[in-house]
């Protein structure tokens, strides 16, 4: 018998054996695609397509324009369902990979079946190839059939297949790739174990181990690196997440949801992972002992590494749990030791199936305890120097600073952009704006503020980790301000809302003896743009008095203001409207672009020359709103432009505001 005929004969027998899997898949895909499409279409019609029409019901006018809109929204509904980025296939693909992978090689966990299959005059490689390929074909054919059924259903709703064929085929391709990566992982888990339940547990470990470890490390960094203003080691977290097929799948879908596209290197990485998984599975299958069936693990050499990794991860998790309960060193160490002991004993029971052998690997256990304790202490005492880190001045190209005394009075930067023929508003947080726009080159000022932050961070670590949080400790450290009847009220330095105000300083206490009366603490985010292209960030709580001189210099800098205030992003040639508001009322507004441009120029020039001393002496009483052409287009699209232009103007505006404008110009 030729290899080809033998392959197809074995394939036919295997498909008969797995007919229940095929039936289960058909049921799942039928409800996930054709039935789901019918439900989506009916819900859209019942809500008058409000979900696709800016949450505004689409009124049935019977006009060609209305019918065109309905068809557009129906097409969008179909595209959303079949495109890559829909999260529904995630559940389908992962579940199918586990069921198909486990069912295809379940015989390896039964000694009688192993003896039978391996007694056949068929090479192991041929058996592996048949069962492996069948697992991919079962899913791919079922998926494709139901996409064809969905195409027919969409056509019945009037949606042309040409409108969604491209996104549908690409979604099919990408989901199939992630299915195959997950499927290869399940097969490897089946090959490495001798019992089906252990194989399923191994599958869970392979799916979750690296993302969980990444999340735990991030959690430790979040707790013990008190100056972190972003994920301290995001590259490590992303790398660990992508080492799991499910984690990589979820991250890819999240990227699509965030507006990113699939890159060629992502597809190439998936193809490499699929090939590597298939080869690894084949090698394990060839070397797997026949007597491995019925044992927990098929390969003795893999037992220790897997046990050590799981035990350490368990210790990290329980250590973090107990730390969150008490925030004490002894409880963190207790959680680490207990977690390691429990995990070690549970795994030994799974491995050995004998309670007498719970501590049969004492040296490994002691090594894990020592490693876990050292891991915890390294974060608790910051052996990495994270909170003390300041780059060498020669390695810094530029820097950004965000101080709460300025940031607290800024709104998020809103700007309108056109997407798919429609205007939408994007919002940028203040910290993101500073991180991406500020380019400070005065390193003396930046490092002076950073060094003050490092000094205070050391004291904050001592307060946070060496003592209980309490009113006395908080008052000593300045972390908590307690209101008292004898408070001196609130001292306002600056005022109003907008970038011309400075801050509200709350000073509390009954007299000069109260340490809280003397100073306030502000938060400072520092971003170092290094010459090697990397960006490093830190966040400090800093005494305002300790950096006041540096802050005076900083605020006088043009680089600081242009990186802090979004108003400098406005271009004079793109303005559509300017509004002056005071005490909640509009005192002046104009659509005269020439006037708006002059107001913007005057405001920008005045803001650049402003100093901290000026702000201490002046109280802003109003705010200017600049509306550019893009935002005006968005307002008109949403039907708000007329409403904005017809806002009542304070009757006193004529005499007062023109004086202000003349003075500014």
Question: Language-model segments: which ranges?
Answer:
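Internal/C-terminal transmembrane anchor helices
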Residues: 307-317, 347-387
